[in-house]
Amino acid sequence: GKDTEGQTGTLAKKYNARKVMIVYGGGSIIRSGLLQRIEESLQQAGVEYVKLGGIQPNPTDPKVYEGIELARKEGVDFMLPVGGGSVIDTAKAIAAGVPYEGDFWDFYIGKAKVKKALKVGVVLTIPAAGSEGSGNTVITKLEGLQKLSLRVPELLRPVFAVMNPELTYTLPPYQTACGIADMMVHIMER
């Protein structure tokens, strides 16, 4: 609902988050003030954070590797994607990769199973793929252009999803239409 992003810190704290990684795409969450509101909410709840920006549509493995490295270095224990499906999928892949000693891609090719993952909470800014409510993630490996999915609902489904409809009001009509088409395709696939 309205202004629910202000509860992000409290929600993360409820799931024992001590240090969060905020994952996001471009600059719209900065320009709109959303990132600042989320940072303030985390600070008020006493939750530390680091940021990983620049996630592109149809996310690729280099950002996942970067996120895993940053999370390990900084002691991150909770993932907080702010955006749509690509940002959420990247955060889920990082969440699975951080506690794993091998290559996170092992999960996607069936070489290993996810046995442990960081918790994920979401602040949704574009309705589309439904990643905020599923344990699925899709990543493209640039080498060989392999686009594969991973489904681990018991570990990768977000523990909360903040959905303030006002965060979608500034989306261009084309982007909203793309999101609606995405929803319909995902429903028909199931």
For the regions a protein language model found, what residue spans apply to each?
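Conserved beta-strand elements of the Class I
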Residues: 21-22, 78-80, 121
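Conserved active-site and cofactor/substrate-binding residues in soluble primary-metabolism enzymes
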Residues: 3, 7, 15, 33, ...
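An N-terminal, well-structured beta->alpha segment
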Residues: 1-52
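N-terminal small/polar loop signature for handling phosphorylated ligands or for N-terminal nucleophile
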Residues: 30-102
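A glycine/threonine-rich phosphate-anchoring loop and its flanking beta-alpha core
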Residues: 99-190
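Gly/Ser/Thr-rich beta-alpha loop segments that engage phosphate groups in nucleotides
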Residues: 3, 27, 85-87, 130-132
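Local beta-strand N-terminus motif with an aromatic residue
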Residues: 17-20, 76, 158
